[in-house]
């Protein structure tokens, strides 16, 4: 009997607390709402003065979310005064609880919007909401990147698949197995970009001789290209290239038994030395420009050249410091005696056509984030590559 009375009393206390809480909430929303809005608006206004580069703020806790996709409501668009900030805050309290702000440097006015925050794997939903609300972009907080509502990135997201061009012949950056499965450092880079976009990924075969034409083809066969593509001024004249995600430089592969023969380019630049290269890429260009006296042979399939060198059908392969260690570690007949003294110094990046600035911004944002959070270094370690950033 005593236990039942105790439980009844506890239920009554709980009920009274709930009723009291609802009454207080009602009083706050009806009687004190303007005081609350004013207090929050004052805090947001002060916060904005210290953050001229823009922000997204959870006004319920006055905290800054580090992840999410921020999109503004049309109802609060164009609010740029302390008085209008009250309207924005009131709208935010009635909806999602987020306020975004940014300084228009052209007119010196700070603009505020009630904002919805989407999970970062819901970019398609965020872009649709933005389009329905007459917005021009969505902002990915973790990447600090704007995604235009209308653009190439939006097209990829709507399609649901990222199309990536790659030669598939460049271990360990991009290689296609006979089964059709692609693997490699560059492949994992693009998988991360696709994950950030919330889409699937499909690889499209290209080749070194046709790479530039394939990137520039109309209609496009893929969105951009990866896999051992060195950043050069010549490529940037006609196409866009991302920031570098891998250091690179020209070196050689030779038979291990001959490794003492080759100490410099001069040792290779002789008629009796047969140098083999793949066609159409920078390896062939380097050989033609720097080894005029050597006997240069062109072989169509890049991935077959190391074995041909090991078998004696060529003496030297012009390759890169990203590729050479893979073959040396997997074939004891081969050596890379000048690996620590590359003939050139450069970086590898993502190649795309001009006009896709939104794609370039997105790719660069992912690369920057991977450098910042250590995932790019871990990917280097996985493939035995030297991290130089």
Residue spans of the language-model regions?
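Periplasmic-binding protein-like
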Residues: 246-254, 321-368, 386-389
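Alpha-to-beta junction loops
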Residues: 163, 198-200, 217-227, 272-274, ...
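C-terminal motif of bacterial Sec signal peptides marking the signal peptidase cleavage site
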Residues: 24-27
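Short glycine-rich His-centered loop
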Residues: 159-184
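Acidic, polar ligand-binding/catalytic clefts
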Residues: 187, 191, 195, 200-267, ...
